[in-house]
Amino acid sequence: MTTITDTAASATKTPAPRRRMDSMRTIALAGGVLYLITFVASIPQLKLFAKMVDNPEGYVTGHGSNTAVLWGSWLEVVTALAGIGTAVVLYPVTRRISKAAAIGFITSRVVEATLILVGVVSVLAVVTMRADLAGATGARAEALRVTGHALVELRQRTFLLGTGLMAGINDLFLGYVLYRSRLVPRIIPIVGLIGAPLILASTTATMFGVWAQVSGPAAALALPIAAFEFAVGVWLTVKGFKPAGLAALDAASAPTQHTTPAV
């Protein structure tokens, strides 16, 4: 008895294994570098915005250079764009594990970036108003001070929601994908899946006034997420995806072969 093998993808030309592995390495490297960019670009921002955030009215009505605030704004733009980049670059891989999680990851990154950029616009408006306030007097000066203070508070709230709430959500999506696929050591996504609820809880506590946005509890609860994102960036940059994880993905997505007896 002979057999006839029908393969669903028989007409599809598959890339050579070496070419496929090179493509996966490129994706991992790009995703890892972008993650490291978001991490590095976000570190100086707390210091650069300190003068404005600690004393909004004093900053608006005071004199001096805006250089630190402008650099901080530029780094926030870099952080926002690199954040979107991580989700877009990794999409060809993440969608193979869960299309819903992959789309959710991209969506949450876009929302996060949008919130960050709204904050940047607010900061740049404060810089402009600060220059206008130099020659203002009376009611106009008071109006500029109040508006400037409100814009600083807007920046703080968008920053809280962007780098707190949305960061927790997008790390839940990525943590789930990485844990399920074993593309990186499982301890890395476990840290992310633990850290995401913690930063969501911290963001909620800050919104309801339990503690300040810049405080010991807020910093402590953000550490696991910071460790997760840094570890993802380093691992993907240095090591790439684990071969065993890629092999499992290939096996899961391989076309099903049906063997039927010939008549």
Where are these regions (language model features)?
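Hydrophobic, aromatic-enriched alpha-helical segments typical of multi-pass transmembrane helices
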Residues: 2-263
